[in-house]
Structure formats: structure tokens, C-alpha cells
Amino acid sequence: MTRQAGSSWLLRGLLLFALFASGVAPFNWDLPEPRSRASKIRVHPRGNLWATGHFMGKKSLEPPSLSLVGTAPPNTPRDQRLQLSHDLLRILLRKKALGMNFSGPAPPIQYRRLLEPLLQK
């Protein structure tokens, strides 16, 4: 009977040691390396600086494309109103050409006076 009690204590002790060892093992992987080995490694804290200044000051050799000329947004409120009225007229003329219904909301009165003579032509 004492032999079974002694072996159970031994088994419990081994099990406890195994659990303790498995819990401590992952922490040992993060220990720092000795200084002699770490000093041999060259560390660049900012990363690779190989092509840092390669494109600094470079100018484009191609002229700006003509499609970008004149696409700047209108600057003044008058220019914006003119652009909006042109866009609205173009949309309405497309709807008329496609035979679409004008069942949407009516344009504001200020634009209606501009559009009525153009649509009656």
C-alpha cells in the first residue's frame, strides 16, 4: 500500500514539474542574446536608406497633356453658375434626344429663365 502511495506522489511530482516546465519554456525564447553575438549584427533603425534621395528634385520630361488644360474648377460664383447651367442644359438636351421623361423636379426659377429660350429652339 505504501508503494502505491509513493508512486502516486512521484507521478504527481512529475506531472507538476512537466506543467511548470511547459509554462516557463516559452519565456526562455525571448531572452536577449549575449553581447558578443549581438554586437556583430549591423542594425539600421530607420530601415534601408538605399534610394532615399534618388528622385529628389527630378522634373518630368514630358509636357503636360492637353486634356488637363482647362479642367480647373470654376473660381467665381458667376463661373460656377455658368458651368452648372451648361451642365444642366446638356443633361436636358440628352434626355430630350433620348426621349426620356422630364418627370423630375422642376429647375429653380433663376435657371428656368435661362433654359426656356434654349429649349424652345
UniProtKB/Swiss-Prot annotation:
Any single GO CC term annotated in Swiss-Prot or TrEMBL for this entry: extracellular space
Residue ranges listed under propeptide: 60-121
Record note on disruption phenotype: Significant reduction in the sneezing response to capsaicin at both low and high doses but does not affect pain-related nose wiping behavior or apnea induced by capsaicin. Abolishes the sneezing response to histamine, seratonin and the neuropeptide Npff. Abolishes sneezing response to mast cell-dependent allergy.
Keyword Cytoplasm assigned: no
GO annotation, biological process: antiviral innate immune response; Leydig cell proliferation; negative regulation of interleukin-6 production; neuropeptide signaling pathway; positive regulation of interferon-alpha production; positive regulation of osteoclast proliferation; positive regulation of respiratory gaseous exchange; positive regulation of testosterone secretion
Residues annotated as signal peptide: 1-24
Induction of synthesis: Up-regulated in lung tissue in response to infection with influenza A virus.
Family named by the database record: Belongs to the bombesin/neuromedin-B/ranatensin family.
Summary of the function given for this chain in its UniProt record: Stimulates smooth muscle contraction. Induces sighing by acting directly on the pre-Botzinger complex, a cluster of several thousand neurons in the ventrolateral medulla responsible for inspiration during respiratory activity. Contributes to the induction of sneezing following exposure to chemical irritants or allergens which causes release of NMB by nasal sensory neurons and activation of NMBR-expressing neurons in the sneeze-evoking region of the brainstem. These in turn activate neurons of the caudal ventral respiratory group, giving rise to the sneeze reflex.
Protein name: Neuromedin-B
